[in-house]
Amino acid sequence: ILRAMAKKHGPVGLVHIDAHTDINDTMFGSKVAHGTPFRRAVEEGLLAGDRVVQIGVRGTGYAADDFDWSRQQGFRVVQAEECWYRSLEPLMVEVRDQLGEGPVYLSFDIDGLDPAYAPGTGTPEVGGLTMPQALEVVRGCRGLDIVGCDLVEVAPIYDTSGMTSLVGANLLYEMLCVLPGVQYRA
C-alpha cells in the first residue's frame, strides 16, 4: 500500500498507532515480517521520516535504545506511558503541526489499544491506549491530507466476546470519517 501511495504522492507522512515500532531489521530471520514494514518503507524511500509519528509504543521487550533507529530517521516516538491519564487532543494538535499539508498515511495496529479494550490480537501488550484516547487520535487526524489508512492485527479467534472486532469496525468507521472531503454536520 505504501508503495502505491509513494508512487502517486512521493514519500508520505505517517501516523502510526501501535504497541510496537515495526522497525526491526529482521524478525524470525526474515526481512519481511509484521515487525519490519516501516524499516523497509524508510529504506525504499516511501516515508518522509520527519513526518512520521508513532503513538502508544510499549512492551517488556523494549530497551531505551530500541527507539534510536526511529529517532535517527526523524520519527517522533510517543511511548504509551506518555499518554497515560491524559487527553491526547493536545498531542494531536502537535501532530497536525508536524505533519503539515503533505500526504499522510494512517495506520492503526489494534494492539496499540490496551488489551482490556481489544484482546483479540496476536501480540497484546498491557498499558496501551484507552478507547477514548484512540478516538481522540483518529479524530485528531481530521484536516490532514490522508491518502490511505489501515487497521491491522485484529485476530477474532483470540477474543471469544467479539469485542475486538466491534472496536476495529468502529475505528475503521472513524478513519473513514476523517478522510479529506468528508462533510460534517454542524
Q: Regions from the language model: what does each represent?
A:
Residues I1-A186:
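Conserved alpha-helical scaffold segments that buttress catalytic/binding sites
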